[in-house]
C-alpha cells in the first residue's frame, strides 16, 4: 500500500475517460440492436488485456453547461435514474472532487451500495465537461465489494449551437469479473448464452439498469419534462460561482508541489509556469496594500468602462449586464506583439463586512480571433480586497493559458510581459483610485505601461503594433523585473541587507554556518522590535500632546484646514513612487461569519491522500485517508496544512518566524517540518555517483543455498521418511529459534540513554511498542524518564506502571539480567561475574557522540523518535565541515615506529598494520591502543570478519574478529576482545604474498608479484589463479562484490606496468585493461556502479567508464608534488581523498553528477575491447582537466552503443599537511577518515 495524492488520481481517471471517449486507436464495434437514430452504442473486448469496453454517444437539446449541472447535482440522480434509490455526497474535497454514495436496485438484485470517487473537469471556455468515477474503499466499507474501473460522461458543446450538446459515456470492466459473474446485476442463465446478453444486465454507475441505451432514454425523458426548470438559471452565473471557488483553491495548489515552476519571485508577488501538451499555464499571485477602502477599490475594478485600469487591453466593450454583479465583456487583449479578441465574464462582490472582490474568466467566444496561431485565455482570476485599518489589503491571482508560441525565446518574452503587466496593473489601480478620490496632487503617479491607443494614437490594433511600442514595453518590463529574483519573502529589507552583508563576509572567511546566521538574525529582529516599540511610544506621546493642545486652545480649530494642507504636503514628500506592500495581515475579523484577511501565500486547499494497493489483484482499488480541515484561521489549521505553508521556507526564515508569536514557535518546532527540510536540503543529498548497498553475509548464505540445492538434485529425490524427518527437524529448529529470540538480550551497543524510547527498548528486546495514542506515548516517556541510572532500584516499580501494550513486551523473568546489562553500559560497576575485559583495557571510554559514532550496523531509532531539528542542525554543520575540510578534531594514534601498511575501521574501533610486524587495535573515542598483536612474519593486510557479531557486549563495534594476512602466505583469524588476544584459526594457502583481500566472506584473494590467487577457505580449494596478471609487480588489488559488470563481483588490480585491470571474480577472466597513465598505477577506487578512479606516480587521477574502458573519460592533474599512493571515496558526502608521497592529503568535492541516462548494457566480451563505442565527455573542475574523445570498433556489431556519462564537478577543495612523511593509506566513512604515513603516524580526522 502507498499514499497517492488525490489530484493525481483525479487526473488519471479523467484522462482515462477522455482517452476512451475520443481515441481512434480502439477498434470499436457498433451494436446495431442497441443503437437507434438518437444514439449509437459501441463495444470492444480485449482478451489479451482482459478488459471489456463500451461507449455510447447521443445528442441532446440542452446546453452542455446545463447538462453538466444536471449530472453533477447528486441530489437529482434519483429523479432521472429510475433504479437509484439514494445518492448523496459523503465528502467534498473541492468543487471538482467528491466521494459519493449510490444505492441501486434492479430485478436481479434487491439492493446495491457503491462508494465512488468522482472527479470532474470543468472548461466553459472549450465547452468541454467530464465527470469520471471509480470505486473507493472507505473505512467501514465492504473490502470485497465489486471494483468499478474508471468510467463516466464526457459532455461537448456543438459549435454554433448554444443550446445543444453531445454526450459520450464510457464504461469498462474486467472480463474475468464477467466470467466469474462478480458484476452486480449480471447473471448468466445459460453457458450458451450470447456474449452480448450481459450488456443488458450489467449495472454501472453511469448506466441505468445496465442497458447502455437506457441512460440516454431516461435522461432525455427527464429533460423534456423539466426543460423550463433546467434552463431557468443563466448558466453564466453558475460559471462565475465556480470561478470564485476555483480561485480560492488555486491559491494553494499553484506551487512547485503541484508541478508549477517559479519564473519570478518578489517580496509581494510571484510568477509560476506549468507546461501542457498544447502550451502552458501562467499564474501571477501576490498582494499589495493601499490606503483606500475595499469598496472603493471594487468600484474602480468594476467601473462602467470595463477594465479601463488594465493597460494591456487595446479596447473593451460591454456585451451584456447579466445582473447587477455579473456582466459579459468583449476585450481586445495584447500579449506582446499580438492583439487577441476574447469574451470574459466579470463579477463583483461587496461584503459581507469590510470586503470586496472582482473575478473574471474567459468563456467560449463566437468572435474569438487567433493571431498568428496564438491563443490566450483567462483562467479564473480575481482581486480580493480585505479591510485593513483605514485602508485595505489586496490579494490577487491572475491565471492565463497560452497556446501557439513555438520558440523558447517567444515563451520567455510572453512570460516577461505577463510579469510586467502584473506590476503595471497594480500601479494603474492605485493611480485610478487616486484620481477618483481627487488626490492626484498628493501622490505622484506610479509608473505603468501605456495602452496602444495612449501611446500610438489612432493607429489601432488592426494595423499592427509599431516596433516602437514593442521596444517600449520590453524596456519597461526589464526595468521592473531587473531585481525581481533578488527579493526575499519573509525578512525585512533592513535585515536582508544586513544578512547579505554578513553572508558575503562569511563566504570570504569560509565560515558560513547556520548557527551564526541564526544568532545574527535573532539579534537583528530584536533590534527591529525595540525600534518599533520606541517609535510607537513616541507616536503615542505626540498624540497625547496634540490632544492637550487641542483642549487648551479651541480657537485653533479654525486653523485645521491649513494644518491639513501642511500634513498633505509633508505626506506627498514622504511617499515614494513605488508600490506599497505589507508582509503579515492576521489583524482583523471582518464579519461575524469569520471572514478574515488571508495572505496570498497561505494554502487554502485541503490536502487529500488516498491509499492505493500495490496488489495485482486489486490494482485500481483506492482507500480514503481522512483529513480534517478548517479555514477559520491559522490557529485552527491542521498540522498538515501548516507544514505545507512553512515547507517552502529556509531554515533561517523558519527560525525568524518562530520569534513572531507563540503559535509560530510551536509550529516551527514540528519534527515533520525539520524532517522535510532535512530530506529536501541538497547539501545532504548531493548528486554524486553511488553504488547499490551490498550485505556481505547474505552473499555467502545465498551461495551455500545454491550449493546445497545443487547437491540435492545430484543425489536424487529423498524418500518419504527422510522428508518427514526433515520437516520434524525444521519444526524443532523453529521452536529453538523462537525460544532463543525470547531469551536473548537486546544489543545495547550505542543505546542513547538520554532517549526514553531508546532506553525502553532495552527492556522490550528492541521492539518499539505500536498502536499507542499520542497521550500514551507521552505517558510512557514520562515513566521511563524517571529511571535513575545511578540507582536502578526503582526500575521494577516503574515498569509496572507502563500500559498493558508495553508491559506485554517485557519478560519479567529476564528483568534482572537486563538491569545488570544496563548498569554495565551506563558506566556503573558490575556486581555479578568477572569484570569485563574491555573495562580493563579502556576504562576511560566515553560514550559515542554524533561525531565519532561510526557503526553503520548500530541501532537506528525509528524516524518518529528522531529530534529532526537537532538532526538537521548537526548534519548541516557536519556537511559544511566536509565541504570546507575543517575537522572538529584531529586525534593522533601513536604507537607505531615504521611505515603504516593498512588501516581498517569498524564502528568506533580501528586496526592499523605497520612494517614492524605489529598490529594495533584502537579505541577511536579516546585514541588509546586497547590491544596489540605481533606476527611471526610481516603483516600485510587486515579486515574485519562481518560474518558473525561478537558474543560480548562491546560499545565500540559489533565485530571483533579480524583476518590477518602475513608475508609468508599465512592467514590468521583473531578475536581482539579476548585478553590476551585469542587466535581462532590459521591457514596457509600460499608460500609468499604481497597482499590479501578478505572482502568476500569465505574467500581469500592473494597476490604476489604478478600472480593472483583466489581461494575457498572452507574447502581449501584454489578457485582460480592468474600467473601473469601484469608484466610488473602488482601494487594493489581490491574486490567489489556484486558489480554491474558481473553479478558475482569483480577484482581491480593495479601495477607498476602503468596499467590497471578488471577481472571477473567467478572465473578470473580479464574484463578490461585500463591503460593511460605515464607511470606506475598505485591505487584504484570504485566510483558509483560504472566508474573507477585510479591514482598514479604521474600525480594524476583518471576516471574510467568500466563499460568502455579503452581509454579514460577524464583526467585530473592534482596539486600533489609527489606520487599518489592511496585514494578513498566517501560517497555519502561525495568526497574523494588522495594521499601522496609529499605528505599531503587533498580532498575533492563531487556534485551535480547526472547519471540518469546510464543504462545497463549487455555483459562485455572479455577480449579487452568492448567495441562499438563512441562518446565525448567533459567535466567542470578547478584543476586541470583533460577531455577525451574515444572511438573504437570491432567486428561484433551486435553490441549496443553505450550511453555517455555526464560528469559533474570534481573540485579540489583543500590540501591538508598534518603528516610529515608520505601518506600510505586512507580509510574513510561518513564521520571522518583515518590516514597512515611512512613514519608510523596515524591520524584520526573527525568531522
UniProtKB/Swiss-Prot annotation:
Any GO CC annotation of this UniProt entry: SCF ubiquitin ligase complex
Alphabetical UniProt keywords: Developmental protein, Differentiation, Fruiting body, Repeat, Sporulation, Ubl conjugation pathway, WD repeat
Chain intervals with Low complexity compositional bias: 552-566, 707-719, 726-744
Chain positions covered by the region annotation Disordered: 484-514, 552-576, 697-744, 833-856
GO MF assignments: lipid binding; ubiquitin-protein transferase activity
Domain named F-box: residues: 631-677
GO biological process: cell differentiation; cheating during chimeric sorocarp development; culmination involved in sorocarp development; regulation of cell differentiation; sporulation resulting in formation of a cellular spore; ubiquitin-dependent protein catabolic process
Skewed-composition ranges (Polar residues): 833-846
Disruption phenotype: Cells preferentially form spores within chimeric cell populations and are more likely to survive adverse conditions than their wild type counterparts, which accumulate preferentially within the stalk. Such mutants have been termed 'cheaters'. Over time, mutant cheaters may be expected to dominate mixed populations, as they ensure their own survival at the expense of their altruistic wild type counterparts. The spread of cheater mutants may be limited by the high degree of relatedness within naturally occurring populations of Dictyostelium discoideum.
Assembly and oligomerization: Component of an SCF complex including at least culA. Formation of this complex appears to require activity of the MAP kinase erk2. Interacts with regA.
Protein name per the record: F-box/WD repeat-containing protein A
Chain's gene name: fbxA
